[in-house]
Every structure is written in C-alpha cells, then in structure tokens.
C-alpha cells in the first residue's frame, strides 16, 4: 500500500508542477488552459479544466483521450460539455487519483456520457455515495477499475 500512495503522490506532484509551469507561462485567465507540444509526426494537447477546488485534466494525443480526475458534482456538466467541444467521443484512459467527491464526481458524468475503454484508480474502497455511483457507472460500461502496480506501462497516443 505504501508504494501505491507514493506513486499516486508522485503523479499528483508531477501534474500539479506541470500545471503551475503552464499557467505561469500562459498568464491568461480562462475556464480551461491548453498547452500543445508538436513535432513532425505527433501532437499532444493538455487541457487544464478549472473545476474549483478539485482537478480535471484532459490529455489528447493522436486521436486518443486521457481524462485525469473530473472535478466535483457541480462541475460535471462543464467537464462533459468541454470534452464534447474538443470532439471527444471516447475516453481511452480515465484516471481517478482518489475517490474524494471533488475529484471523482465529474468522472461519473463522463462515464454516463462517453464510451470509456480503461478506468484506472487507487486500490481502496470508499464508503460514500459518490464512490458507489462511480463504481456503478464503471460497471454499466462493462468495466472494472484497474489498480496497476508501480512500473506498469500503458500505451497512449
């Protein structure tokens, strides 16, 4: 369990550091922040969605979509609408950093509105209604939440 929390903490620290760098460089207030990196044969776009206290990040690369957290219930429709405006129809990877309401509630809305291929989350159960809604929405897509071990590789983009 210690390794999983350590991995999650490292991932959160990396993503938040990236967010701070990009927001500092952009300096433009907006409901969503986008950074793109392009090379001769690939493009990756990272969208930081303003969902209040929580977090939501959309990463797009070569036609694939990764959603990291979804914000709280009050921002669920914003996240769904934003993804639709980005022409998202399928979420290849949905990642829940943890199951607090301000990170997972928006994922429920996305599960109810998009086809999802893979759901990745922390390896524990939380005794809350929003966690149960999340689990039910994952199951409705015929999926289970994956709990990868440190060092597990995934192909994206």
Which residues does each PLM region occupy?
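Non-globular, low-confidence helical/coil segments that flank catalytic cores
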Residues: 2-12, 17, 23-157
